[in-house]
Structures are given as structure tokens and as C-alpha cells.
Amino acid sequence: MAYTADYDKFKFPEGAFKGKRVLITGSGKDGGIGQGLALAAAANGAAVVGVHFHSSYRDGFDMVDAMRKNGVKAFAMQADVTNTRDLWASRSYVIEQMEGQGPDIVICNSGLTEKGYRFGRALPEIDGESRAERRARVRREFIENLAESKLVMDTKIDGFVYMTHLWAGEAVYHNHPVQFVYISSMQSIEPGVAVPGYVVANWAVLRLPEVLKTNLGKASNMASACCLMLPFVRTGMTEEYAGNAKVFGRWQPRMLEPFEAAHAVSQLLSRPADELNLGNFKLGVEGTVDKVSLKWSQVKLEVKDEALGWSDANPVVS
């Protein structure tokens, strides 16, 4: 696959990226959410756009070329976000490409999905299968499915944590504020079946803004962070389900196109960074297949501690 996006569809009235140095992880794959966000930055006045990818190098290079043809200063960055040495090696390169400074906005979008499996449930039996064959099949499925879940969780959780540690550290050291935007999913708070690694990974990153603030302490004014919970967007990973309302119907009349999701994100990011800081924002989809209406809401993840009557009545005393 190569670059196929319509650049003009990503031109929006909002000025969220104007004059900013923007780095987007997981933005190389054609037709992906990351690509949409990178194009939104490029088409709406970003000073520099960093397009990160790991394996989607052909799509990524083609997109960077398209941006440059439109007069945008853009560069490609290849790295494994779960490899700390890879990321550290990219640091000086990114700063060089951004004319001696770190990014103003870091959008963490790296992530994978799962093909789906019967989490916590036994595999159905196959007629005529011997006990030995079933045991071998169950073992293989167990190993392969959990390996996939681990990769999904590592890519999202480790990737986001590593990028945050790297660029927050640069921001604090150089006294230059940075804004982190973490791309999560509606499934983080409304889990779907068969994709446990994906759900857990997207839930975990919702805590990152608070974790960052707590660790920065007095320097927390140098880095702000928020999480975006997106509904289903039609990408290479979701294309096969685009016509299946059983997959997305509880949230939306149809899957969003990447430029629609990018427009909504651009609208949200046009708000002041301190207004968005520590927030978890959910993108709702209303309307019909022919005409959708996208609206943001803020999700409060509050911890409520309730006493247990039986324990109050019989505490353990020592």
C-alpha cells in the first residue's frame, strides 16, 4: 500500500496546530487514525510535522513526500516505541529536524488490535478430535493468543510511557512546555468481547496524565496531558467490520472516516492546553449514516471508597 489520502479533506477551520512542532507516533500507515492526525497538523499550519512509524515505512515516506509537496516541513522517523534504545537514538534526530527544539505537541497513537479470541473460555470441541489433538490445539491457541495480547499491551502502554518519559524530560530540562495527547478508545470504558489486550491497554493509558503530573511535581507546568477516547474509525485494521453494525452499532450509525475523526480532534485541541490537562474526553457520534454529528464530552474517572458493613462490624485487630 502507498499514500492514498485526499490532502484537502484534512483542511479545517480550527487552528490547533498552527505554528506548532508536532510529533505523532503510529502515523505512517495509510488510512490510519495517526495518518489523519498527521495530515491535520500538516494541512493546518504546523511548523514541523514528525511522522513516526515502525513497519509502515513505504506509506510513511510517501506521506512525508506529499506533505513536502504541499509546502510543509515534514520528516519521517522510524523507531520501535517499545525499544528504549531505539527511542533514545531518535531523540537527537527529532530535535535536529525540529530546528533545535523538542516538539510542542506529542500525539501518542501507536497501537495494534487483536484478531479476537475466547478470553477465559474453553475452545469448542471438534467432532472426531482425539484428546491429544485437542490438547495440542488448545496449547497452541493459548500461546498464540496471549502473545498477541502481550504485543498489543506492550505497544500501547510501553510506547506511551516511553515517549512521555523522553519528551517530558526534554521539556522540563529546556524549560519548554509540551502537550501530550494520548489516543485511547471507547472500549477502555465500555469493553467489547474477544479483545482483552486491546481493552486493558486502552484503559491503562487513561491514568498517564495523572501519573505524569504526580511525578513532575513542581515542574508539572512544563507538561500537560489528556486522553481521547475515540469510537470506531474506518482504518486498515477495522475495514473488514465497517459493514457490520454488531461491531460498532452501540456507539454510532457508521464508522467514522479518518478525516472526520481528525477534524473532531483538531476542534478539541484548539482549546487551551491547561483546559484539557488531565482530562479524558470521549467523542460521541450522533445522527444517521448519511449525516453524523460529532460531539465531545468529558469522562470523570473518580474513585469512590465505600466501607463494607461486615468488615466494620468485625475488624481485624492486632
Residue ranges and their predicted role:
Residues Y57-R58, Q78-S92:
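The beta1-alpha1 cofactor-binding region of Rossmann-like NAD(H)/NADP(H)-dependent oxidoreductases
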Residues G26-D30, L112-F119, L123-M153, V172-A219, ...:
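Catalytic loop of short-chain dehydrogenase/reductase
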Residues T164-H165, E210:
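A short, exposed helix-loop element centered on a Lys and neighboring polar residues
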Residues M1-L23, Q97, R121-R140, A147, ...:
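Non-catalytic terminal and boundary segments that flank Rossmann-like NAD(P)-dependent oxidoreductase
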Residues A2-A5, K150, A223, C227, ...:
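C-terminal helical subdomain
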Residues A46-D62:
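Conserved glycine-rich Rossmann-like NAD(P)H-binding loop of the short-chain dehydrogenase/reductase
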Residues D8-G50:
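Canonical Rossmann dinucleotide-binding motif of NAD(H)/NADP(H)-dependent dehydrogenases/reductases
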